[in-house]
């Protein structure tokens, strides 16, 4: 009896640190405000699996309600987004998002693999195969109003000088409740959109 007790105690001691290490491996704790984010590896890049929620100038909660930030993260102007990621992470480039799109199948159903499996209006949730868990956080307009909650997820890229990007705009990748596509557009830099940091 004492042998088996000693065996199980030894097994627990050996296995427990490994379990803790595994848990931390897929998480990142922001030293600036102690918030923890899931991380996922896709196509050789490590993405945050949650929208950034670091409070800084030029960032907002949907409809200025703090509770929304706890679910959807903050909405950032492009200038704020460029500076918001913690050390070691950065705002994704257009090429980074293209790699994500390719990993999701590079077709009109890519959004199905990227969307969270809850929260989207209508019957348009994803299956979250890649664990990117895109949430429909909506956006802040330049007149300080808000819209598109449950209908759109917008993510800033770091590109503002690419072909097809108008002066004063930057490239935004988006998912919509209208389809399972994952695409991009050009939007004014003073709009508020979500941020996913990458490294």
Q: Where in the sequence are the language-model features?
A:
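Conserved positions within compact, well-structured domain cores
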Residues: 21-199
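Sec/Tat signal peptide C-region and signal peptidase I cleavage site
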Residues: 15-20
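Bacterial N-terminal signal peptides
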Residues: 6-14
């Amino acid at each position: 009896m004492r042998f088996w007790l000693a065996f199980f105690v030894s097994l627990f001691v050996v296995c427990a640190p490994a379990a803790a290490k595994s848990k931390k491996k897929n998480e990142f704790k922001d030293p600036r405000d102690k918030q923890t984010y899931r991380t996922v590896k896709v196509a050789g890049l490590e993405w945050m699996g949650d929208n950034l929620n670091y409070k800084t100038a030029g960032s907002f909660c949907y409809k200025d309600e703090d509770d929304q930030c706890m679910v959807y993260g903050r909405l950032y102007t492009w200038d704020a987004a460029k500076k918001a990621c913690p050390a070691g992470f950065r705002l994704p480039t257009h090429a980074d998002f293209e790699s994500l799109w390719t990993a999701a199948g590079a077709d009109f159903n890519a959004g199905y693999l990227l969307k969270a499996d809850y929260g989207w209006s209508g019957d348009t949730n994803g299956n979250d195969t890649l664990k990117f868990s895109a949430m429909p956080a909506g956006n802040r307009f330049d007149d300080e109003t808000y819209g598109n909650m449950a209908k759109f997820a917008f993510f800033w890229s770091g590109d503002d000088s690419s072909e097809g990007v108008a002066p004063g705009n930057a490239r935004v990748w988006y998912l919509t409740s209208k389809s399972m596509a994952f695409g991009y557009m050009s939007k004014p830099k003073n709009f508020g959109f979500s941020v996913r940091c990458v490294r």
